[in-house]
């Protein structure tokens, strides 16, 4: 929500919100209280002073605490601090809330901003802010600023996330704290009533929630394909010819694993969308919820795509290092000696030359498109695009990237997919396995692009239902569907 500032006259120092509520006045005339003298309280005080506020600190030991604050800060006892301001940051832990119980008569009608966090997710039945509200029912409790670290407060919002989540049961208090966040150069996000406080308190405690599944999938795929390549390229020569190729493990085997994992993860990104489309076509509606596993899969597509990009970049780095290996130099010298010994003047192979040229070219194009997909997934970049632009890049160009990557693998395999010597231990080559999932995804996309299917899918996305068509044909009424059941693809 934007505020309207009276900047026409130097005497107009008040800020008015669109709903007519008086916002915070000029920062130089506002005193803000902070209860607590810890690291967060110190950083918050410095931030408030830089933005022109006068700060009063309430501490149990003001004489000792004053040594850690600037001299312009008024460090005093809790009781004295509470009488000097109407906006108070409660920068103490939950277990110390009761220390303010005897001073509750001084907190009547005042705004208490709870900035505390817990040690683990859902540690208590109710949020800290709701617990604070139960202790001081006559105060206006606001939850906010808990997602900002003390380090970010000191450095300023340019070096950290600028979003601050704020909620309160009192609209007027919430709007004042929102305006305060704007004055501190943060971006406030209004989450409504105090019932959202528990979700806000859980946000800083979550560790890559959406990344766990994709990372497990990536590690599992990497482990499987690494062992698969190890058995085929190291164990097989040793078992058959007593040839020791264990030197290939650090570079060559790893480099064979990386591209397979990259293209498989990229295929999983778009396979989820195909399954979702097939699900909607099967049931003839978009109002039926996806199964939990598919819903989770759809939410993790960004993480799968970024992991695919990571494996592709590492694959390029490994490939560039291949000629630098000592083993590669020895192999090159051996090939040169054998050519001289066989009296071969020209070893030019037109087919191999074209194959490698196209192979590298398609690889570069694939990496370029993956880089574009990765860059547009950055929030600041995606926010600058409208929905059609973002969808075109992530969907249309994404499928183009998958198609070019598939060509890259096909050209790498070339005729070797039909050569018997490449089926060691009766297992197909690595590149054959890498082509299975991308081929399924590309074939599935081609089926969805057929006019008879794409038209039906577009109608479903616009709200058409199979049951509605049947009911209309029979002259029946369509039952009302709650908007809560709507699942957008």
Curated annotation (Swiss-Prot):
It comes from Mus musculus (Mouse). FAD binds at residues 151, 159, 280, 301, 377, 394. It is a multi-pass membrane protein. SUPFAM superfamilies: NAD(P)-binding Rossmann-fold domains. It is found in: Cell membrane; Endosome membrane. Integral membrane protein that functions as a NADPH-dependent ferric-chelate reductase, using NADPH from one side of the membrane to reduce a Fe(3+) chelate that is bound on the other side of the membrane. Mediates sequential transmembrane electron transfer from NADPH to FAD and onto heme, and finally to the Fe(3+) chelate. Can also reduce Cu(2+) to Cu(1+). GO terms for cellular component: cytosol; early endosome; endosome; endosome membrane; Golgi membrane; plasma membrane; trans-Golgi network transport vesicle. It catalyses: 2 Fe(2+) + NADP(+) + H(+) = 2 Fe(3+) + NADPH; 2 Cu(+) + NADP(+) + H(+) = 2 Cu(2+) + NADPH. This is Metalloreductase STEAP2. It is an enzyme of class 1 (oxidoreductase). Its cofactor is FAD; heme b. GO terms for biological process: copper ion import; copper ion import across plasma membrane; endocytosis; Golgi to plasma membrane transport; iron ion import across cell outer membrane; iron ion import across plasma membrane; regulated exocytosis; response to hormone. InterPro entries: Fe3_Rdtase_TM_dom, NAD(P)-bd_dom_sf, P5C_Rdtase_cat_N, STEAP_metalloreductase. The modification Phosphoserine is found at residue 482. Pfam families: F420_oxidored, Ferric_reduct. Belongs to the STEAP family. Keywords: Cell membrane, Copper, Electron transport, Endosome, FAD, Flavoprotein, Heme, Ion transport, Iron, Iron transport, Membrane, Metal-binding, NAD, NADP, Oxidoreductase, Phosphoprotein, Transmembrane, Transmembrane helix, Transport. Residues 258-406 form the Ferric oxidoreductase domain. Disulfide bonds: none annotated. Its main location: membrane. GO terms for molecular function: cupric reductase (NADH) activity; ferric-chelate reductase (NADPH) activity; metal ion binding. Fe(3+) binds at residues 228, 318. Gene3D superfamilies: NAD(P)-binding Rossmann-like Domain. It comes from the Eukaryota. Its EC number is 1.16.1.-. The chain crosses the membrane at residues 207-227, 258-278, 304-324, 358-378, 392-412, 431-451. Heme b binds at residues 315, 408.
